[in-house]
Amino acid sequence: CAVSREHALAGKKKLKITDLYGQTLMMVQTGDSEVNDRLRAYLQREHQQIWIEDTPRFYDISVFNRCAETGNVLLTLECWKDVHPGLITIPVEWDYRIPYGLLYAQNPPEDVRRFVEAVRAAMR
């Protein structure tokens, strides 16, 4: 999760789910991600002390800015830890992992196609 550098949780090395009690967790809306849908259902069922705010499917700078400005907590990926200078990323102790892949255009140029094929071959 990401929080503003001034957030009460910002000094923690790792978060427990109970650290999120009383917080608003920003995450993609239902239907955008199977893993996030499972996490949302779990939080709504077992941890109702955490409020959830829907974000667009693809985070843009406005989502990161909103997190920094509101003091909300943003569900984010470790690989995005340096995307916004006003936020820090802290891992959470839970059993949810987001699979990550390659993002590329539907009709990519030839060099991108060759790269994707090389990655596919390496993954086999």
What are these regions (language model features)?
Residues I61-E110:
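Beta-alpha-beta core module
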Residues I17, G22-H47, V112:
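Secondary-structure junction motif
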Residues L25, Q48, G71-N72, R124:
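Generic structural signal for secondary-structure transition and capping sites
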Residues A10-K13, R38, H84-L87:
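Short, charged, surface-exposed secondary-structure boundary motifs
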Residues C1-T30, R97-P108, R120:
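Hydrophobic/proline-rich hinge and linker segments of small-molecule sensing/allosteric domains
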Residues R114-R124:
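Bilobed periplasmic-binding protein/Venus flytrap-like ligand-binding cleft at the lobe interface
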Residues V28, Q48-D60:
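Short beta-strand-to-loop elements that line the ligand-binding cleft
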